[in-house]
């Protein structure tokens, strides 16, 4: 049965921890996670937007990642209400400033580029926004300790370098 939630759009998503940053290992949760995010809506504070970006990236939803990135990087005013965006100094808004919005935004973008939460597998560009169709990253560390350099063009990988940075036990 449906639960009557007084605040369906609440910004907290801690009940989705298993999906991200956890290993999200249960594919049967995919629809439930998507439903929760759909119900909560997109707009929120900086740190909540960052978490939503990472969750949508983990779902492989590039279009939603793109939409959320636009919300997370829009201009924010210190006089504004509780919504995300960036202040003129590029601090993520809550308001006030909260560092987890900035760190989380970077983590969410990285999750859209590379995922390594499933043992023995690295997924490249799993939720790449269309606006990021060409690019490169250097020095990412994937699980279980693999340094990764990646170039892509037209949303497809064109060059990849992998280097073990620690002995693997996997």
Residue ranges with predicted function:
Residues 63-170:
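Non-catalytic C-terminal accessory modules of carbohydrate-active enzymes
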Residues 48-49, 158:
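Short, surface-exposed connector motifs at secondary-structure boundaries
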Residues 1-46, 67-87:
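Extended glycan-interaction surfaces of carbohydrate-active proteins
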Residues 47-48, 105:
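The tetratricopeptide repeat
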Residues 17-27, 51-60, 108-117:
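Well-ordered alpha-helical scaffold segments within catalytic/enzyme domains
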Residues 8-9, 39-43, 56, 93-100:
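Short, contiguous acidic/charged loop-to-helix segments that flank catalytic cores in large enzymes
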């Amino acid at each position: 049965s449906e639960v009557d939630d007084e605040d369906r759009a609440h910004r907290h998503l801690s009940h989705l921890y298993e999906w991200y940053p956890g290993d999200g290992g249960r594919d049967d949760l995919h629809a439930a996670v998507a439903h929760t995010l759909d119900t909560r809506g997109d707009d929120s504070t900086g740190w909540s937007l960052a978490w939503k970006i990472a969750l949508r990236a983990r779902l492989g939803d590039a279009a939603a990642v793109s939409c959320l990135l636009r919300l997370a990087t829009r201009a924010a005013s210190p006089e504004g209400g509780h919504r995300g965006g960036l202040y003129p100094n590029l601090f993520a808004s809550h308001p006030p400033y909260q560092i987890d919005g900035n760190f989380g935004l970077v983590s969410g973008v990285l999750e859209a580029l590379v995922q390594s939460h499933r043992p023995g597998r690295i997924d490249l560009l799993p939720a790449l926004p269309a606006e990021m169709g060409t690019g490169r990253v250097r020095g990412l560390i994937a699980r279980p300790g693999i340094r990764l350099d990646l170039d892509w063009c037209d949303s497809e990988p064109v060059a990849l370098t992998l280097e073990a940075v620690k002995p693997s036990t996997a």
